[in-house]
């Protein structure tokens, strides 16, 4: 199973996509910090911020486990409220990465020695 890992650079506002076959990500939760070596970014530390499964259902931080659930939502990730007081039942994935998850969103917490994305640093 291949994971697409999107790494967001908080300094520049750019994001970079990597693919990995690593099983080290299975069992990790939203909010956990992982080593950048999982996606060949030596020296980087990444924080998991979300993701989606093979059917496109978003992961949500307050649903524990790796299963897919239909939950009643007022707001937050996975549902955008159109009018005040409106609630809706939506299918969402839990906060734990499993083999069904295909996309993992991360952000950089600690930067490594090499520039992100293989771009040369501007030394001017």
From Swiss-Prot:
Look up the record and report any one GO term of the cellular component aspect.
ribonucleoprotein complex
| GO annotation, biological process | translation
Q: Does the keyword Ribosomal protein apply?
A: yes
InterPro entries from the entry? Ribosomal_eS6, Ribosomal_eS6_arc
Please tell me whether the keyword rRNA processing is annotated for this protein.
no
Q: Which family does it belong to?
A: Belongs to the eukaryotic ribosomal protein eS6 family.
Q: Which NCBIfam families match?
A: PRK04290.1-3
Q: What is this protein called?
A: Small ribosomal subunit protein eS6
Name the source organism.
Answer: Methanococcus maripaludis (strain C6 / ATCC BAA-1332)
């Amino acid at each position: 199973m291949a994971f697409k890992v999107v790494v967001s650079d908080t300094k520049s506002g750019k994001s970079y996509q990597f693919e990995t076959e690593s099983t080290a990500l299975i069992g990790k939760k939203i909010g956990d910090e992982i080593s950048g070596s999982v996606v060949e970014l030596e020296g980087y530390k990444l924080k998991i911020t979300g993701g989606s499964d093979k059917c496109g259902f978003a992961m949500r931080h307050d649903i524990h486990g790796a299963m897919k659930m239909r939950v009643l939502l007022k707001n937050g990730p996975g549902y955008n409220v159109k009018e005040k007081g409106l609630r809706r039942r939506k299918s969402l994935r839990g906060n734990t990465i499993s083999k069904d998850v295909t996309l993992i969103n991360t952000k950089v917490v600690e930067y490594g020695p090499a520039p992100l994305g293989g771009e040369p640093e501007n030394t001017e």
